[in-house]
Amino acid sequence: LTLLFSTSCYSSITTSTFIEQTKLYENPYWSKLLHYTNGESEIDSDNFFISKDGKTDLKKELFETINSLENGQNNVLCRFPLRVKWLKENIPSLEKDIVNYSCAELDEFLTLVDAKYVTMVFPTAHINSPASMYGHTFLRVSSNEETPLISNAVNFAAKTDDTNGLIFAYKGLFGEYEGRYSILPYYEKIKEYNNLEQRDIWEYDLDLTQDEIDRLVLHAFELKDSYSDYFFFKENCSYNILWLLEVARYDLDLVSHFTFKTVPLDSIKILKPYNLIKDSRFRYSNMRKMKNILEE
């Protein structure tokens, strides 16, 4: 992906004036890009922000981002490609005074993912796992509808090595785990849920345009090295997957519907009023397949 940075001192004055006049830092989409709710970001790692006050100050974060771009800090440019893309689209002077710059890591990532289709995946509840007693949701991004097993999965989960269910439940309730996004082969998730844990899986194909899919993938790249505190009942896997969809489509309002708890099944139901679901499929677990055979 070819990105751009500014080289004009004059553009800095023009850009600052434009931002103040338009109050671009108050744009709802800017707050979505930074995962803001109730005046602060839900992302807890410092590396997600350019400004030291970025977690609580949208204006400072926007101006610091612009300053970094104008100073040619290519690590910022390549680290946050969707932010840069959106800023270019909304600040005319920034688009005018920029030159090409290539980001090898981002190019490799986009080639690997090659997303053309997005599916919400819902493995049903796993009674023996405290983390999955309500089920789980993640996204599958595919380049070909006919070969889903060689697609990639975009997942959000607590980073933990604890095997004691009580310890996991306690830490999960009080946000003592880091929740992280990850991208991994879809067949690994199928193996984990469908075969090893014997969980049935629902797949919901989402009706997203290519531009919306591109935004989702770019934002997943921006999030891959950051974390947010994981809370079992609310800011869990399903809640954080909804952030990706909100960023993908400008008019979506999803996470605000979940104030106290986020049940995975409810996070799927909330997609229906927006006509996001265009098709669904059911993938039987090996145990259910065997049971059906025995009952025939």
PLM ranges: what are they?
Residues 114-198:
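Glycine-rich catalytic cores of cysteine/serine-nucleophile enzymes that process amide/ester linkages
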Residues 1-7:
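Bacterial N-terminal signal peptides
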Residues 168-238, 248:
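N-terminal accessory/precursor segments of enzymes
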Residues 123-125, 143-144, 156-161, 211, ...:
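An acidic- and aromatic-residue-enriched active-site/binding cleft used to recognize and process polar
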Residues 143-148, 211, 247-253:
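Secondary-structure boundary elements
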Residues 109-117, 130-132, 207-220:
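Active-site-adjacent bridging/hinge elements
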Residues 9-101, 204, 221-296:
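Activation targets extended, charge/polar-rich intrinsically disordered C-terminal tails
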Residues 83-120, 132:
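Well-ordered mid-protein domain cores that form the structural environment of catalytic cofactors
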